[in-house]
Amino acid sequence: MKITASLVKKLRQRMGAGMMDCKKALNATNGNIEKAIDLMRTLNTTKSAKKLDRITIEGLVKINISANKKTVTILEVNSETDFVTKSDTFISFVNMLGVLALKTTPTNIEEFLSQPLSNGDSIEKAREEIIAKVGENITIRRVQTIKTNNGIIGTYKHMDRIAVVTILEKGDETLAKDIAMHIAATNPECITEAELSSDLLEREKAIFIEQSKKSGKPNNIIEKMIIGRMKKFVNGVTLYGQPFIKNHDTTIGKLMQLNNTQVKFFVRFEVGEGIEKKEKNFVDEVMAQI
């Protein structure tokens, strides 16, 4: 049977694969689209397995919030390149997972990955099919469910790469969103100084002491220098100590006092944070594609 451009186009639309892959599959199955699909899925399962150890440092974050604004889920899904993250196939996959996360409100990633999709398929099967379509490894890295009875939820997402959820004790959604936006920009370690570990504080203090000794200044001056540097450090890593990004004349702590409320919780996801990208030489890169 003659393999026409129209036939190749139909197979591409159904499989989302490259033109040459579709043409080869149609030639191998004498132009039978259904058999070509089965063949491609079989071959792509093998190809997908080869992609599973590739580093996925790009991706998207997704936030979904319930109608009553008391439950919210935050999700990160990764790919190898930002080219794939912009594809309709990947975006649709992430959107589907976001809806499922809000529906099932999982407590951890393992629980989430065990949930069936609306068509009865497993998330893993859907992931393998996406890998086959886009030609890259895809990982569902993390998910978190946040619930509140009386708090005010604020959310903010920046360029689909940073997502933040906050809960205020009381107040309004605009303030909660402003705090989420601030956290997206500044990435604080925690809310208040009381939450910082003593080990972290002692380590920073030890560094400042050694640096100050080299100044050659009197001990009483050195002590003041250390106190000043520690205060600056604490303010820099705690949410309440940071200057508000929309008004640098006040801190988040003072802003909370002014609005008679408190930040009870926050979580921040940034695509690829904490993932170490392996360095490969050119030959390794080429061989990895085979």
From Swiss-Prot:
Q: Where in the cell is it found?
A: Cytoplasm
Which species is listed as the source?
Vesicomyosocius okutanii subsp. Calyptogena okutanii (strain HA)
* The keyword Protein biosynthesis is assigned to this record: yes
Explain the purpose of this protein. Answer: Associates with the EF-Tu.GDP complex and induces the exchange of GDP to GTP. It remains bound to the aminoacyl-tRNA.EF-Tu.GTP complex up to the GTP hydrolysis stage on the ribosome.
Q: Chief location of this protein?
A: cytoplasm
Q: Which CDD domains would you find in this protein's record?
A: UBA_EF-Ts
Which InterPro entries does the record cross-reference, listed alphabetically?
A: EF-Ts_dimer_sf, Transl_elong_EFTs/EF1B, Transl_elong_EFTs/EF1B_dimer, Transl_elong_Ts_CS, UBA-like_sf
* Gene3D superfamilies the record matches: 1.10.286.20, DNA helicase RuvA subunit, C-terminal domain (1.10.8.10), Elongation factor Ts, dimerisation domain (3.30.479.20)
Q: Which PROSITE patterns does the record cross-reference, listed alphabetically?
A: EF_TS_2
Record GO terms (molecular function)? translation elongation factor activity
- One cellular component term from this protein's GO annotations in UniProt: cytoplasm
Quote the protein name from its UniProt record: Elongation factor Ts
Q: Where is this region: Involved in Mg(2+) ion dislocation from EF-Tu?
A: 81-84
Matching entries from HAMAP family are given as: EF_Ts
Q: Which family does it belong to?
A: Belongs to the EF-Ts family.
* Keywords recorded for this protein, A-Z: Cytoplasm, Elongation factor, Protein biosynthesis
